[in-house]
Curated annotation (Swiss-Prot):
It comes from the Bacteria. Catalyzes the formation of phosphatidylethanolamine (PtdEtn) from phosphatidylserine (PtdSer). GO terms for molecular function: phosphatidylserine decarboxylase activity. Its cofactor is pyruvate. One of its GO terms (biological process) is phosphatidylethanolamine biosynthetic process. NCBIfam families: PRK00723.1, PS_decarb. This is Phosphatidylserine decarboxylase proenzyme. Belongs to the phosphatidylserine decarboxylase family. PSD-B subfamily. Prokaryotic type II sub-subfamily. Its EC number is 4.1.1.65.
Length: 294
């Protein structure tokens, strides 16, 4: 059972996990772990399932998925019957009113929907993956020089599950460098997997870029793929100015993660998020929601 902190009710909700039995089997049973290492974590598995989700045959999965996870389609730009396939639904866009944004210069917003963890004063060689597990930022982006600039800074981990809105956005106005791709495996990013695979973020497929923001300095954006996420699509134009809240890109089917690194003393994350992280809980947030300030 995964408990998530709800900022509105100040209580904990139990996360509905898509494919929970499969995840438990793959990461907690001897046979499942063997199958995971031999096949599930490999590109071929995610590619095959991704091809299915791109096909018209997958369209019939949409309504059942919406009903099972109680997804509010009134926030979506399309009706159910307008989606061409499951990936079209999965990467759905929302109405502008669905995710209000505070455009105040001193306010930091969430880059997407998901479950947020915040770690302050980070050690580059011991960045927290989940309580009890760490990884190296230098290894994550394969660029020690860039990584060193974020020593003592703040790390935000936004975990998306398959039921979430899967587009990610810019947290401020500014310009972003071209995204650098790093090949890797396709482990799940569910906490069950994070508790069973050391340095998971450094093993999975990922992309990173430097966003030069107007109000929070240089921000390191990292997008991490996961099981069945065969594609991370960047929709922004490198070095072209963007506005706060504009789309940066999106993930195709599967759970996935966005990680942001801020330099030391450039932001202050809201205290409830920091406190819940220390207690071992993620906080549910939506794109555009205020999560910190200068």
């Amino acid at each position: 059972m995964i408990k998530i902190y709800n900022r509105k009710t100040k209580a904990y909700d139990v996360e509905q996990v898509a494919g929970l039995k499969y995840i438990n089997w793959s990461y907690a049973s001897p046979i499942g772990k063997s199958f995971l290492e031999l096949f599930i974590k490999k590109k071929m598995f995610s590619k095959l399932y991704g091809n299915f989700c791109d096909s018209p045959l997958s369209k019939k999965k949409i309504k059942a998925f919406i009903d099972e996870f109680n997804i509010d389609m009134s926030l979506c730009n399309k009706n159910i019957d307008e989606f061409e396939n499951f990936n079209d639904f999965f990467a759905r866009t929302l109405t502008p009113e669905a995710r209000p944004i505070d455009y105040s210069e001193n306010i930091l917003i969430s880059p997407g929907d998901g479950r947020l963890s915040a770690f302050e004063n980070i050690d580059l060689d011991k960045v927290v993956q989940i309580k009890g597990y760490t990884y190296s930022l230098k290894e994550l982006i394969d660029d020690p020089k860039v990584a060193e600039e974020f020593e003592g800074g703040t790390c935000l981990i936004l975990r998306l599950c398959p039921t979430d809105y899967h587009r990610f956005h810019f947290v401020d106005s500014g310009t972003c460098s071209e995204s650098k791709k790093i090949s890797g495996f396709y482990y799940s990013v569910n906490p069950i997997a994070l508790n069973n695979v050391s340095e998971l973020f450094c093993k999975n497929k990922r992309e990173w870029s430097i966003f030069t923001s107007d109000n929070f300095g240089e921000i390191l954006h990292v997008e991490v793929g996961a099981t069945c996420v065969g594609t991370i699509l960047q929709t922004y134009s490198p070095e072209k100015r963007v506005k706060k809240g504009e789309e940066k890109g999106y993930f195709k089917f599967g759970g996935s993660t966005t990680i942001l690194f801020f330099k030391k003393d450039t932001i202050k994350i809201d205290s409830d998020i920091v406190e819940q992280t220390k207690l071992g809980f993620e906080t549910k947030v939506n794109m555009g929601e205020t999560i910190g300030h200068k």
